[in-house]
C-alpha cells in the first residue's frame, strides 16, 4: 500500500497499527474445519533450526487471531474466507494447519509432496480513509492458479478477457 505523500503514509500506518484495516483472504484447504465459522486464537512463535525457520503454535508466543468462514466444500477440501485480526508472520497458514486444514500447496505447514501452488491469496482490503465517507474497498480477482479449485468448491466469478 502506497501513499502519495508523507502525511498519507502516516495516516495509512495509523490505520494498520490501530487494526482499522479489514483484510480478507481466500484459501483452499485440505479437510474440513470443525465448524462452518469460527475463531482461531493461539500464540505463535518463530522456531529456528539448522538452515531455516518456521512459525509454531506456542501458548507463550505472540497472540494471533484469525476469523474464518467456510464458503464451499468438496473433494475433501474447503474454500475458506480468512480475516486476520492480528498480523503475525505466516499466521493464516499456521492457523489453518492448527485446525487440521493446511492450505493446499503449503510445503512448510502442509503437505510438501503435493506439488501444487499455494492456494492462498489476498481477496480484499477495506480502508476507512475519511470519517465522512464510505470506506475504500479494493477487491482482487481470483488468481489463475486458484480458479479451477475454487470453481470445484462453488465459486463462480466472471473473468474479463
Per-region residue spans from a language model:
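RNA pseudouridine synthases
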Residues: 2-161
